[in-house]
Amino acid sequence: MPCQPIPIIKKTIWLLVLALCSVTAASAQQTNCSAKIDQLPDAPELRGFHLGMTYDQVKARVPPIQFGRTDEFGVAKISINPSFGPQFDKTSFADVRTISLDFLDGKLVTLWVGYESTFKWQKLDEFVSGMSKSLNLPAVWPPKRGGQELRCDGFSVLASLIAGSPGIRLTDEVAQETIANRREAAAAAAEAAETAVIGDQRTKLYYPSDCSARDKVPEASRATFKDKDEAEKAGYKLAKDCQ
C-alpha cells in the first residue's frame, strides 16, 4: 500500500508543536540557576549587604540602625531610608531610597534595595542585565509579578520597578519555608488547644476549653486530652460546673 501524504493542516500543527517544545526547552535551559547563597559575590549595588549577615555585621555597616522586636517565630524586620535620614551616610548610600531587612534567628534572610531615579539602570531590562552580571547570575530572569524573578538553589532574586525606579529583593527561600512551618505548627497548636480538655486526676472529671471551672484544677492534678471523646474513653466524666 502506498504511503498516504500527511494533510497540510496536520503537518502545520505538528511543526508548531515541535517549535513550541523547542522554545520551552531553550527557555528552561537559559533560566536554570544552580548558584547558592554563599556563592554570591559582594555586589557594589547592594551597598555592603548580603544574605546571611548577623545583627552585628549589619550594625557595623550601618551604626545608626535600630533593630525591631523579634516575634514569636524568630522574625525581625526593619527598613531604613538613607535619602531622608540625616543620620545615614549619603555617600555610601548614593542613589538608594529604601533598604528593608528581614531577619530569622538573627540572620538576614530577605534583603530589599529600592533605588532613586538617579540610579544608573532605570529600565527593567537593563537593570536585570546589570544586576545579573554584578551577582554572577544567569542573564534571563522569567517574568513574575510585574517584574522578573530568578530562582536559584535555596534563594530567589526579584527585580521590579517601584514608582518608576528599580528595586531588587533577595530572598532566602529555605528560611521562608522554616518561617512557614513555624507558623503552621503554631496554628495547629492553637487549634488543638481550643479543642483540648483538662481532666482532674483526683475526681476523674473533665473540663472543656470553654469551661472557666477548669482554672480551678491544680497543675499537679491535671491530665490533658485532645477532646472529650478521649477523656471519656479514659474514664472521665463531664464536670457539673461545665454542663
Report residues per predicted region.
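Bacterial N-terminal signal peptides
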Residues: I13-V23
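N-terminal, post-signal-peptide region of Sec/Tat-exported proteins
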Residues: H50-K90, S221, K226-D227, E232-A234
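Non-cytosolic coordination micro-motifs
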Residues: Q29-A76, T110-A193
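Extracytoplasmic/periplasmic, Sec-exported soluble proteins
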Residues: D38, L46-M53, T91, S100, ...
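Sec/Tat signal peptide C-region and signal peptidase I cleavage site
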Residues: T24-A28
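Mid-chain, structured segments of secreted extracytoplasmic proteins
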Residues: R69-K120, Q243
